[in-house]
Amino acid sequence: MSEIIQDLSLEDVLGDRFGRYSKYIIQERALPDVRDGLKPVQRRILYAMYSSGNTHDKNFRKSAKTVGDVIGQYHPHGDFSVYEAMVRLSQDWKLRHVLIEMHGNNGSIDNDPPAAMRYTEAKLSLLAEELLRDINKETVSFIPNYDDTTLEPMVLPSRFPNLLVNGSTGISAGYATDIPPHNLAEVIQATLKYIDNPDITVNQLMKYIKGPDFPTGGIIQGIDGIKKAYESGKGRIIVRSKVEEETLRNGRKQLIITEIPYEVNKSSLVKRIDELRADKKVDGIVEVRDETDRTGLRIAIELKKDVNSESIKNYLYKNSDLQISYNFNMVAISDGRPKLMGIRQIIDSYLNHQIEVVANRTKFELDNAEKRMHIVEGLIKALSILDKVIELIRSSKNKRDAKENLIEVFEFTEEQAEAIVMLQLYRLTNTDIVALEGEHKELEALIKQLRHILDNHDALLNVIKEELNEIKKKFKSERLSLIEAEIEEIKIDKEVMVPSEEVILSMTRHGYIKRTSIRSFNASGVEDIGLKDGDSLLKHQEVNTQDTVLVFTNKGRYLFIPVHKLADIRWKELGQHVSQIVPIEEDEVVINVFNEKDFNTDAFYVFATQNGMIKKSTVPLFKTTRFNKPLIATKVKENDDLISVMRFEKDQLITVITNKGMSLTYNTSELSDTGLRAAGVKSINLKAEDFVVMTEGVSENDTILMATQRGSLKRISFKILQVAKRAQRGITLLKELKKNPHRIVAAHVVTGEHSQYTLYSKSNEEHGLINDIHKSEQYTNGSFIVDTDDFGEVIDMYIS
């Protein structure tokens, strides 16, 4: 035997072979045919069961026998894949109308595996036989099987639109399909309307076919998504569980789930809800129970007393498979190719298939009727000359000779002669003659009717309509899925997601933040907070886990951090740097932090920069749903820094102090509300080379403490300040020296809450009591606290 060796590039061989493989799995494995809604393996299973007489009116047979028939004659693949497909056709939570009835364990909605095929038994369902009806009447084309030992159908007659009724799902090379199941009566009604009016619009069709009808029921939201899918083949809907509320004897409420979204694993859903409860992601759930039994699906979610059941339900819709989105992708094989099809195209393809099936069946029946008519006419003729026929047969040598004599003497045809010689003697009665004459009349009427169907397209369509109506009447069922026009917006109260707990929030000047339990805080003391060397406490306060923290930086940005998302860390331990929660720039510094309980308030923030700009923005502007990156609080120009952020419930006085000792006090009412991206207006008229070191709210009982670079502290009372208008130069608070003048490096408004100060140089720090600093007059430079020769030049001061 000679060998032919071809020299081919690997690229060409791979491309060619993968192309063949892709075509095979697209056409022969993963995608359904638009005409019968079946994938090849499903079609082969149903045909194998039908061929072997495993029909609904017979006893159940072992599934292993069917699997053996399928892989032995039609589907040369693994037995597991065939059995898996067979089981799916029997699962009433997967198919709207099952095509196989199965005895034994055929899996569950919990995704439990079915029993082995040697244990289960199956037979065709009554509806499945409507897919195969008339297959023996040459209605569809047959092709040789994989080893040319028998024939198999290319498609089933499919007397109802199975693709829409039972839907399909599958993935192949470059294609995927997701076609939802629908209500059989609605689909047939829509098909009937399409037959009457091929120009019917999708809107008109949707009067009859409302939308998907999932075997698991549920609530479908989004008419627009359904319409889009029916028009283009692609669309999105929301499918949510059916949830009812019950009240228990102890006064508690519980949510009862009786229907879940299509193809959601029930046990996984129960597990997920219980995990949300155990992980305290949702507050208010006592227990989750799966109470499903023979009477139907039932999941009970027992709630705590006085919780908002609607909010818990909404939280579960959003954070579990209690609600899912279903994406239509209606791809099917049409004319040998995968196509994305709208509902009109699917119905049209099905209708064309039915026209062909009914026409082929009519031709087959007409041919048989004409053949029978021919035989009946021969028998009637023979009975009219019965004595001569009998005499001729008796004088013949054998059967063959008798047939030839009948053809030659009486001009019977071959078929008629065969029927005559096979006629039994008891048939030669008057009763039989009358019966033959009656049959002749019936055949005449039948032939006339069949020819009319073939010659008249409307008559053929009427046959299709009549048969569809019969199936509709016989198999119709109530819709299981409720359809709602709009997709409901899910609103979740924060109280449901986060248990309410009072905690201590702390922020250090170097940006370390944490929340600490009241118990841990009380067991220690403010001074015992965990700090890095050189760091100090910027702020600490009692907050609730349902509050939100706004962290402001020198870049004019803010971080929006829900308190419950902060790490729960003991008071004596180091907190978490804000950059680990929300990424910030390397040179970005935290300048203040505030706690918000409710953003629906008249309160406002005031922002002040080093170069003397100021602005006011209302608190509601800062509410956001984005937690993962810094947001703009105010526009900070180049070579400027935000140095102060204040929060006020109402307008009040603020004091601005500059490096060169100027001070201006005015009311925030002079500031207009502005957006977050605004830069603001001029706060103070700065001298050359001067800059702002402090902008803070001030009241009549407050004092102001200032620190100079030379180690001096000066404390003044409110009465020295002169209330003026914004953008003026202000008053002088220092005595100007010609040599080494004092410059204010830090200043703070001192209220009754403050008792200590801390001075910082690059390498040292000095602590003292604020009350030890006597109040000074306006034109003084205060009192020296540290010797800069030993301590170093003062660079900052904090008060606490």
UniProtKB/Swiss-Prot annotation:
Compartments (UniProt record): Cell membrane
Organism equals Staphylococcus aureus (strain Mu50 / ATCC 700699)
Catalytic residues (positions): Y119 (o-(5'-phospho-dna)-tyrosine intermediate)
Catalytic activity, EC: 5.6.2.2
Question: Entry's PANTHER family?
Answer: DNA GYRASE/TOPOISOMERASE SUBUNIT A, DNA TOPOISOMERASE 4 SUBUNIT A
Instruction: Kindly state the subunit structure of this protein.
Output: Heterotetramer composed of ParC and ParE.
Q: What molecular function terms (GO) are annotated for this protein? A: ATP binding; DNA binding; DNA negative supercoiling activity
| Gene from which the chain derives | parC
* Signal peptide (UniProt feature, chain positions): none
Q: Where is the Topo IIA-type catalytic domain?
A: 31-495
Query: How does the UniProt record describe the way this protein sits in the membrane?
Result: Peripheral membrane protein
Name one process (GO BP) from the record. DNA topological change
Task of the protein: Topoisomerase IV is essential for chromosome segregation. It relaxes supercoiled DNA. Performs the decatenation events required during the replication of a circular DNA molecule.
Q: What is this protein called?
A: DNA topoisomerase 4 subunit A
Any one Gene Ontology cellular component term annotated for this protein = extrinsic component of plasma membrane
**Site positions per UniProt: Interaction with DNA:** K39, H75, H77, R88, K94
Q: Which reaction does it catalyse?
A: ATP-dependent breakage, passage and rejoining of double-stranded DNA
Q: Which keywords accompany this UniProt record?
A: Cell membrane, DNA-binding, Isomerase, Membrane, Topoisomerase
Q: Which family does it belong to?
A: Belongs to the type II topoisomerase GyrA/ParC subunit family. ParC type 2 subfamily.
Q: What is its main location?
A: membrane
Give the source's domain of life in one word. Bacteria
